[in-house]
Each structure stands twice: as C-alpha cells, then as structure tokens.
Amino acid sequence: MGAADGPVHLPTEYSHYEGAVARTFDLPLLILAQDNLMRRVVFDPNFGPYMGKFPENAGKQWLNGKDFKVAFGHWREAMGNRRDFFLGYCGAAAKTARQLRDFLEKQLDATVLDWQRDFKYSRSIIEEIEEARVRCSAGIFLFTKDDLMSKPDSGRQAAPRDNVVFEAGYFCAAKDKKRVLIIRELGAKMPADLGGDIYASLDDRRNLTVVKQSLRKFVSGF
C-alpha cells in the first residue's frame, strides 16, 4: 500500500487469531509492532497490553533499547503475577487449606493464589476473585461443613460457606468445569449444579491422604 510517508504494512491474519486466543484465555501478551504496520485489531493501541514499537531495520541492539525493555517489563510483571491454581475455602477450614497449599507448592511444585495469604485488604473480595480468574489457570475449592442446616438430610448435616460455592461456580463458568476441582468433606452438602465428576471426597479434613492422588491427577493436566 502506498502513502505519502511510505508504505503501510498489514500483519498476517495469524497474529490476530493467536492474539485473540491468548486474550480469551487471559494470557499475558507481549505485543511488538513494526513501524508503518497498520494499527488494527491486535495491533490497535486499545487492544489491551502495552505495545512496543520497532523500526523495520531493527537489529539485535534494539533489544537493549527503551522500547523493548518497557514492553518486556510490562509482560514480565504480568507473567510474574500468574499462578497455577486459586485456592478457595472458608476461614474455618484454614488449617486444612494450609496443608493442601503446602502439598501443592512443596510436593507438586505448583504455584498457588491463597485468598487468606495473598489477597489485598484494600480491595473488595469480588475484585480479588475477578483478578484471580485472570491470574490463575484453574481453581481448587474446599467444600467443608461450615453452616449447619435447619433440617439436615441423613449424612449431610452442613453446607459449605455460600461464598466458596459462589467462587467455585464462577470459576466453572469462567474457566470450564475441567479447570475446577472441588474437595468435598464427608457430610457437606453438594449443590446439584456442581455435582458430577469434578470433586474428590475428603473423609477427614485433618488428613489429606485420601485426596492426594486426585490432586496429582488434576495438577498433571496443567
């Protein structure tokens, strides 16, 4: 294409396709645009992340310049904030959650976003949950016997805390059921909409041995 100040280049359609996929999955993006490249779709400044620019004749020395370092710095910071799993649970089950987090981090080499340890007090919980959706690849939720039911069914004497159920459902919708593992304590009510094969049974919240194999299998999928 001709222009008064020189040619204007169109990026390959694969750049737009791959950028859209990355955006859909909330992956950190490092976008570098050549000068005179038409600024549209992925290469539009309003697409999202900071965009670096480079001249058509850029050599290796460009990597030492400000344009690259600033763009790379934004991307590296976003990557550093990524976690493998969000861990959701009721505060009353904090001891069990710490055991679970230690197993994930120390034995399975996974990175965990633990709301009690990692959330900022200056922000609302819903803001933190929304950010957790972006930062984490999947979610693990503890459904424990938190709230006694007025008319308990046989063997189901309590329900998980409402906010934990909400968070699990939110992650199922945002990430897909395959990216959510629910660890259900024996006797805790399981919401019908979240039933099926996405949970592991925990007989005793003080002993995680029975669910470790399910955790290994779940973690190995990411």
Where are these regions (language model features)?
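Conserved beta-strand termini and adjacent loop/short-helix elements that scaffold enzyme active sites
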Residues: 32, 115-117, 183, 202
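TIR-domain catalytic/interaction hotspot
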Residues: 1-20, 117-173
